[in-house]
């Protein structure tokens, strides 16, 4: 069962595949004519379409009954005059193509170049790629390494001061009078410190004298030089705490002789006593020489 009569099909295809249509199509496509074989074109196309057959009816089981029953009605469909409509299509297509080409040629070259650079600018491509990479890297870093908040600055522990190890009475700052300058205040503080030192020394001497006195009220004296003031009492030939500090050191070293006296001793005589061991030896040698000379004179006088 054929869809269209053979004569009508041949006329329709011949009208569609006319020579003018192919020429117009080749001009618009800008294809070289050497690649197209125009010999025996119409005969080949007609032969190919004649070999075609309509599909079998088994492929359309749900086809409506009107189409299946009225096959003759479809064959009597009104014939469309394709050859008449083709020139109108050619004219409309050619007018549109000419208008588009004129519009493109009338455009200034600067706009074309700018559009070309806008579309194919390597800088924009690099910026877009760099932006996409940076956003990707930022996202990955945020996921892989979460940023912690700012750490609060801890106060450093203060160093231990000497005042904690050696507590002393806090010094009260001296109030400077409006009439006195700062230099006078500084000198007054130094004088005050010197006075404190003197008082401390006097109390020390008083304590040494108090230690020298016995419980019975008798003042202690050195058995060798008879001094009463000494920083420390030492052991002597008469017992403990019987010699002053200087005489006790000489007694321990074995150089305590009758000619030795400290300069602060009340019994010190420069012609007889000395606080230097070398001078004491010289004095003894002179005494021995004088004794020897006196003995020789006595023997000579007797003879």
From Swiss-Prot:
Q: What InterPro entries does this protein's entry cite?
A: GATA_TF, Znf_GATA, Znf_NHR/GATA
Ranges of compositional bias, category Basic and acidic residues:
169-183
**Residue ranges of the region described as Disordered:** 131-189
Q: What Gene Ontology cellular-component terms does the record carry?
A: nucleus
Q: Where in the cell is it found?
A: Nucleus
Zinc fingers, GATA-type class: 216-270
Q: Has the keyword Metal-binding been applied to this entry?
A: yes
Q: Where is the composition biased (Polar residues)?
A: 131-141
Q: Name one GO molecular function term.
A: sequence-specific DNA binding
Keyword annotations from UniProtKB, A to Z: Activator, DNA-binding, Metal-binding, Nucleus, Transcription, Transcription regulation, Zinc, Zinc-finger
Recorded family membership: Belongs to the type IV zinc-finger family. Class A subfamily.
This chain's function reads: Transcriptional activator that specifically binds 5'-GATA-3' or 5'-GAT-3' motifs within gene promoters. May be involved in the regulation of some light-responsive genes.
Question: What is this protein's name?
Answer: GATA transcription factor 11
The organism is: Arabidopsis thaliana
Starting at the broadest rank, the lineage of the source organism is: Eukaryota, Viridiplantae, Streptophyta, Embryophyta, Tracheophyta
- The gene name on file is GATA11
């Amino acid at each position: 069962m054929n869809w269209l009569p053979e004569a009508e099909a041949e006329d329709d295809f011949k009208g569609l595949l006319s020579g003018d249509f192919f020429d117009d199509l080749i001009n618009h496509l800008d294809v070289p004519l050497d690649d197209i074989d125009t010999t025996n074109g119409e005969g080949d196309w007609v032969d190919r379409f004649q070999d075609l057959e309509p599909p079998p009816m088994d492929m359309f089981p749900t086809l409506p009954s009107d189409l299946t029953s009225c096959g003759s009605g479809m064959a009597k469909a009104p014939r469309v005059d394709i050859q008449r409509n083709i020139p109108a299509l050619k004219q409309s297509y050619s007018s549109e193509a000419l208008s588009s080409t004129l519009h493109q040629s009338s455009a200034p070259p600067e706009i074309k170049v700018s559009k070309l650079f806008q579309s194919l600018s390597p800088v924009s491509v690099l910026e877009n790629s760099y932006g996409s990479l940076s956003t990707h890297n930022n996202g990955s870093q945020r996921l892989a390494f979460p940023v912690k908040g700012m750490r609060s600055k801890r106060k450093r522990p203060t160093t231990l001061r000497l005042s904690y190890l050696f507590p002393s009475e806090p010094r009260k700052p001296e109030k400077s009078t409006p009439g006195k300058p700062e230099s006078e205040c500084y000198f007054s503080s130094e004088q005050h410190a010197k006075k404190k030192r003197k008082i401390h020394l006097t109390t020390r001497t008083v304590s040494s004298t108090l230690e020298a006195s016995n419980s019975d009220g008798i003042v202690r004296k050195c058995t060798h030089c008879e001094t009463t003031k000494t920083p420390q009492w030492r052991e002597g030939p008469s017992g403990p705490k019987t010699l002053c500090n200087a005489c006790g050191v000489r007694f321990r070293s074995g150089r305590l002789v009758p000619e030795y006296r400290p300069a602060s001793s009340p019994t010190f005589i420069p012609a007889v006593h000395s606080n230097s061991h070398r001078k004491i030896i010289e004095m003894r040698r002179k005494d021995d020489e004088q004794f020897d000379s006196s003995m020789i004179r006595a023997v000579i006088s007797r003879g």
